[in-house]
Amino acid sequence: MSNHRKPHKSQEELADLFRAELTTGVGRSVKHESAPKHVSGEAIYIDDRLEFPNQLHVYARLSERAHARITRLDVTPCYQFPGVAIALTAADVPGQLDIGPVVAGDPLLADGKVEYVGQMVLAVAADSLETARKAAMAAIVEYEDLEPVLDVVEALRKRHFVLDSHQHRIGDSAAALAGAPHRLQGTLHIGGQEHFYLETQISSVMPSEDGGMIVYCSTQNPTEVQKLVAEVLGVSFNRIVIDMRRMGGGFGGKETQAAAPACLCAVVAYHTGRPAKMRLPRMEDMQITGKRHPFYVEYDVGFDDDGRLHGIQIDLAGNCGYSPDLSGSIVDRAMFHSDNAYFLGNATINGHRCKTNTASNTAYRGFGGPQGMVAIEEIMDAVARSLGKDPLEVRKLNYYGKNERNVTHYHQTVEHNLLAEMTAELEASSEYARRREEIRAFNAASPVLKKGLALTPVKFGISFTATFLNQAGALIHIYTDGSIHLNHGGTEMGQGLNTKVAQVVAEVFQVDVERIQITATNTDKVPNTSPTAASSGTDLNGKAAQNAAETIKRRLVEFAARHWKVSEEDIEFRNNQVRIRELILPFEELVQQAYFGQVSLSSTGFYRTPKIFYDREQALGRPFYYFAYGAACSEVIVDTLTGEYRMLRTDILHDVGDSLNPAIDIGQVEGGFVQGMGWLTMEELVWNAKGKLMTSGPASYKIPAVADMPLDLRVKLLENRKNPEQTVFHSKAVGEPPFMLGISVWCAIKDAVASLADYRAQPAIDAPATPERVLWGVEQMRRLKAAQAQAADAAVEPA
């Protein structure tokens, strides 16, 4: 063993190292732990794993009807194909059929009826995927059609809901509206969004002893998959182990939607005793899985001559699809964020969870918050246009204050408010005032091309609104060579969570992050995990890992104090070294001495978010631990002959507290902005009259590409503003808040179109603002301008 020991360093050399700073701890731009493997193709995803011997491939037959009774289901023809092992229907599920994540409503396979085009009716497992597909399509399925509900407005009018409606109220909105100097009503349709993760839904299951299963699943929620697989099989949770090393993207689409392939594979393995794998082709993935919730919004707003809100009522109708899924919490969050940055005063916010015969819509980055924010930003624009004011001035006038006008419609006080100072900084750095005047002059001289400019804020609440989910666990082992093994309950989907959590542990021990190995998220190492969602991954799991690391560090300090007979204050960890009074040791040497001293070098860690609560009956509380802030200023140019547009420039200022990793945080801000911009401009979901999704692949569903980026994109993180709350090293979440920065592009497009009517009217441009919708807005403004001119001419004609 002595041949493998590192060369001994003198005390002078160790002292020099000790005086240097750690280069890979918190606050450093450490590269993503898998970046080289991502670039080289060596990163292992589930479909890259070697197939198990005797493995089966699973394919599901999907419903072709939006709403129908199944009058005949015969899988006998499936067995005519050599290699078919089993054809499954709902009757073959040994345990619980329903896999609804919160409340029932999601059968694994259709049971007597289908409720959307794309619902899984049966599944076939065979030696090859192609054989399974052919066999599944050979099954005989006959239907009796029922009347579908495909439109969210129809569902709202019929009160066709998956869950009860909910209301937030503060003050007297009816009286305030009645007494307001000005009043506007309007409606808005907000489209959904496909997650379009690069890796489609996939699971691979290996049966183990005693009826257990090892499940390799691309999921944001390993514990939920564990629970549902166990319930589908009728076994206890401890028989099921979920292993999740990395996902090829998630964005919320693998929070609940990943469970069905895992459960189907588990049922196949249960019946056959053979391993099974299911990977959805892109088209089937888009047909089966839910999207971001489309919303229909109705509003009634009262305001004064300056644009200050007096009273408001907003009705938010979320298109939930055929089942509840997570729609209760998603519509709740839309309601929570229907204020965005603004003090609503007297407000009534109603949230409706509408049932339609489409795929069950689900979590997506922002989790309903973006839809609520789009609604209030539409209102701010409409108020400003009606008064002939710059929308930014109306926005600033209605911002939450620091010591007054600072209570939300759900009765949480907005603390540590950075909105005004961030807006002022971005106004100055983006030269908003100068560019606004230049754009007005450009538009006056340009009959076809029109420019638009908008600066919009973001105030996003951080925490799961289901309060019990705000907890996390971690597990750390230190080996006698000084290397560290880390597991936590979060899941890596490319966002850099593992890198940040490793940096947290590196900071605690003051060692290089290269010493730390993070392996797959695994339910038999860290149990009872919360989903990696709600921007909470680092906040929760980083804190849990910090807790575990500090527990071990405390043991090491106590041991060193005893062993070297010094006080604990004489012991300091720094840059891979430990100073014990005058003695300096490499970190690994202290670890070895502690091992010989019979000190435990392993620890679990746990964290739960403090201060938060929400009383749903009273519709009040503090659902969010803190708010993350941001602002974006976007400039666009619109061709009024075609409705086409380009993004010219975007300036972003975003609040991440004390950044754990500036490079990763800037990447998240850039990516979030582009994804939000895509949702509001080009990502259009289209269903035909029979409820079939027609945009079910990249040929018909467009996501932003390189050419769609702003020609000039400037991103800055807010400096010297650590999070006042006791988060992990006073950082802030950065997963979801930047998504809403894309709203600035949508508002800028509307600003350009509004110039056609001298900025005195709000164009009716629903989201996404496709060129077709923009052209409709252009024609609306031109007709309005012509009518205004005609009325003016009539007014000056002699009697």
Placement of each model-derived feature along the sequence:
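C-terminal catalytic domains of large/alpha subunits in multi-subunit enzymes
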Residues: H4-P7, A90-A91, G234-R239, A269-A276, ...
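Phosphate/diphosphate-binding loops
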Residues: D127, R274-C320, K543-E572, N576
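Thiamine diphosphate
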Residues: G248-G273, K277-R279, L497-V505
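Short acidic, glycine/serine/threonine-rich loops at helix termini
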Residues: L97-V102, A135-A138, C217, Q226-L228, ...
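Flexible, low-hydrophobicity surface segments
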Residues: M1-S165, R183, H271
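Helix-loop-helix junctions that connect adjacent transmembrane helices in secondary transporters/permeases
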Residues: V153-L233, Y399-S483, M694-D708, D712-L717
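Short beta-strand elements
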Residues: A43, I202-P207, Y296-D305, G311-L316, ...
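Glycine-rich loop/linker segments at domain edges
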Residues: R28, S34-G41, Q167-S203, P294-I379, ...
